[in-house]
């Protein structure tokens, strides 16, 4: 880290942590009792804090593994010995929530290290761009909000980013172990451990593909036609996978992830599924429109990079040149929206989430809207893919497979499910110009201000309950 860049980084981290501490104080004053999912997480963590680890003490409404509680106890328990605090203080709601604030500091540092690793250091990428990119992602609204509640998001992000960083540095055993830690926070994080393995495979495939293209006499026969490149890559993959040398090399590199995969399969067999506890509200289904919702979500939060007159012009030009393909894609998308759109009971009933109002006032009110939005979905998907064109075709393939696997089976539309894939995506696009980063950061700041203000000040009550309710992501 260059000296000047070190100053930028330290200033950004210090200011972010200071603001976070002030917000944490405001949250602590406003929320004296557990809120939303905290009514399950906090009592369970407190039981662990008291030393009650038996299964009979487990809340069956909790559907994730106890990673958050175990790490929390490991962090706050030493305070009893170091500071002489009582167990009541150490296991309080405020202390447990503070663990996520510590995770947010770790996430800030990991994001910076990942930007330095993923984005090569060159004259085109200045130190201010890396620090601004880090700051922007650290205050990404849907992630930043949950730093102040006792949810699994911050810890899940920490271990997944750490696993990705270790993978990029070639420490695959450490990466797989951290992937297991991430899995202990949220079971679907196993997909991002697979992504780390896929990253290794994509790197080796890219190297072999470049070698193939550089040969004077291509071993593959010339192919002509509209899908020539696709068929050529498919032929290459088939030839590559037939080589024992190639497969053994990949096996030696990825065996820690393969072992983790076997452990996950064993867990699923023994548990009878991926979800623990109450499964009635977490049934898997083929919810293909989740991809479209993610594309829209990404377009909204990355609009300085994905939405511009030149982008729209390029897209329209491409549509005209390949209008038959566009027509087919549109037809398939409309069919997927028609046959595979689901509305989870929580989405329809819980008016504390923003998704409730998006669904009720847009999709539920106007039946045709979900079809009229298909061209916008296609543009968003194309713009996302276009922004990743600096990555290899094999990396893109691995990323979109993992994206599909992690969000399509989810019946419930909830923005929290989009956080990790969004951050992975945002890390891997080329560093934008400083002006766009400032625009993005400013928009995030405005969104954060609005959501925090609404959450803390615009409360309401249900007719059948005296509890204070709040609007949130």
From Swiss-Prot:
Dol-P-Glc:Glc(2)Man(9)GlcNAc(2)-PP-Dol alpha-1,2-glucosyltransferase that operates in the biosynthetic pathway of dolichol-linked oligosaccharides, the glycan precursors employed in protein asparagine (N)-glycosylation. The assembly of dolichol-linked oligosaccharides begins on the cytosolic side of the endoplasmic reticulum membrane and finishes in its lumen. The sequential addition of sugars to dolichol pyrophosphate produces dolichol-linked oligosaccharides containing fourteen sugars, including two GlcNAcs, nine mannoses and three glucoses. GO terms for biological process: dolichol-linked oligosaccharide biosynthetic process; protein N-linked glycosylation. The gene is ALG10. Its EC number is 2.4.1.256. Residues 1-6, 86-97, 197-249, 305-323, 389-392, 458-473 are cytoplasmic. The chain crosses the membrane at residues 7-27, 65-85, 98-118, 131-151, 152-172, 176-196, 250-270, 284-304, 324-344, 368-388, 393-413, 437-457. Keywords: Endoplasmic reticulum, Glycosyltransferase, Membrane, Transferase, Transmembrane, Transmembrane helix. The keyword Transferase applies. Pathway: Protein modification; protein glycosylation. It catalyses: an alpha-D-Glc-(1->3)-alpha-D-Glc-(1->3)-alpha-D-Man-(1->2)-alpha-D-Man-(1->2)-alpha-D-Man-(1->3)-[alpha-D-Man-(1->2)-alpha-D-Man-(1->3)-[alpha-D-Man-(1->2)-alpha-D-Man-(1->6)]-alpha-D-Man-(1->6)]-beta-D-Man-(1->4)-beta-D-GlcNAc-(1->4)-alpha-D-GlcNAc-diphospho-di-trans,poly-cis-dolichol + a di-trans,poly-cis-dolichyl beta-D-glucosyl phosphate = a alpha-D-Glc-(1->2)-alpha-D-Glc-(1->3)-alpha-D-Glc-(1->3)-alpha-D-Man-(1->2)-alpha-D-Man-(1->2)-alpha-D-Man-(1->3)-[alpha-D-Man-(1->2)-alpha-D-Man-(1->3)-[alpha-D-Man-(1->2)-alpha-D-Man-(1->6)]-alpha-D-Man-(1->6)]-beta-D-Man-(1->4)-beta-D-GlcNAc-(1->4)-alpha-D-GlcNAc-diphospho-di-trans,poly-cis-dolichol + a di-trans,poly-cis-dolichyl phosphate + H(+). The keyword Membrane applies. Its main location: endoplasmic reticulum. GO terms for molecular function: dolichyl pyrophosphate Glc2Man9GlcNAc2 alpha-1,2-glucosyltransferase activity. It is found in: Endoplasmic reticulum membrane. Belongs to the ALG10 glucosyltransferase family. It comes from the Eukaryota. It is a multi-pass membrane protein. Disulfide bonds: none annotated. Residues 28-64, 119-130, 173-175, 271-283, 345-367, 414-436 are extracellular. This is Dol-P-Glc:Glc(2)Man(9)GlcNAc(2)-PP-Dol alpha-1,2-glucosyltransferase. It holds the Pfam family DIE2_ALG10. The lineage of its organism: Eukaryota, Metazoa, Chordata, Craniata, Vertebrata. GO terms for cellular component: endoplasmic reticulum; endoplasmic reticulum membrane.
């Amino acid at each position: 880290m260059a000296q000047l860049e070190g100053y930028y980084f330290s200033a950004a981290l210090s200011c972010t942590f200071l603001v976070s501490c002030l917000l944490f104080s405001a949250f602590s004053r406003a929320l004296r009792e557990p809120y939303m999912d905290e009514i399950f997480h906090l009592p369970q963590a407190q039981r662990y804090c008291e030393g009650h680890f038996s299964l009979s003490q487990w809340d069956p409404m909790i559907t994730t593994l106890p990673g958050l509680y175990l790490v929390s106890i490991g962090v706050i328990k030493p305070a009893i010995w170091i500071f002489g605090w009582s167990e009541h203080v150490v296991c309080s709601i405020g202390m447990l929530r503070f663990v996520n604030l510590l995770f947010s500091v770790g996430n800030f540092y990991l994001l910076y290290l990942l930007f330095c690793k993923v984005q090569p250091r060159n004259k085109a990428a200045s130190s201010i761009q890396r620090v601004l990119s880090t700051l922007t992602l650290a205050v990404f609204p849907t992630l930043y909000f949950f730093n102040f509640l006792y949810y699994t998001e911050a810890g899940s992000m920490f271990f997944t980013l750490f696993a990705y960083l270790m993978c990029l540095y070639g420490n695959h055993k450490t990466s797989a172990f951290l992937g297991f830690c991430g899995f202990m926070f949220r079971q679907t994080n196993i997909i991002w451990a697979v992504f780390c393995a896929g990253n290794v495979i994509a790197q080796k495939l890219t190297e072999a593909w470049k070698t193939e293209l550089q040969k004077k006499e291509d071993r593959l026969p010339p192919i002509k036609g509209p899908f020539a490149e696709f068929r050529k890559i498919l032929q290459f993959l088939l030839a590559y996978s037939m080589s024992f040398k190639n497969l053994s090399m990949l096996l030696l590199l990825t065996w820690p992830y393969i072992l983790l995969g076997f452990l996950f399969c064993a867990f699923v067999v023994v548990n009878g599924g991926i979800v623990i506890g109450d499964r009635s509200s977490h049934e898997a289904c083929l919810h293909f429109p989740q991809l479209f919702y993610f594309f829209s979500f990404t377009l909204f939060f990355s609009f300085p990079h994905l939405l511009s007159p030149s982008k729209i012009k390029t897209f329209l030009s491409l549509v005209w040149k390949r209008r038959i393909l566009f027509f087919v894609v549109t037809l398939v998308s409309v069919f997927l929206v028609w046959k595979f759109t689901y509305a989870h009971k929580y989405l329809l009933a819980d008016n504390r989430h923003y998704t409730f109002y998006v669904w009720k006032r847009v999709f539920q009110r106007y039946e045709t809207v979900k079809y009229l939005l298909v061209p916008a979905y296609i543009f968003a998907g194309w713009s996302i893919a276009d922004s990743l064109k600096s990555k290899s075709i094999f990396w893109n393939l691995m990323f979109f497979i993992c994206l599909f696997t992690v969000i399509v089976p989810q019946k419930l539309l909830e923005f929290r499910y989009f956080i990790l894939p969004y951050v992975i995506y945002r890390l891997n696009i080329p560093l934008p110009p400083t002006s766009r980063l400032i625009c993005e950061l400013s928009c995030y700041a405005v969104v954060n201000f609005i959501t925090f203000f609404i959450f803390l000040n615009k409360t309401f009550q249900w007719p059948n309950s005296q509890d204070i309710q709040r609007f949130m992501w």
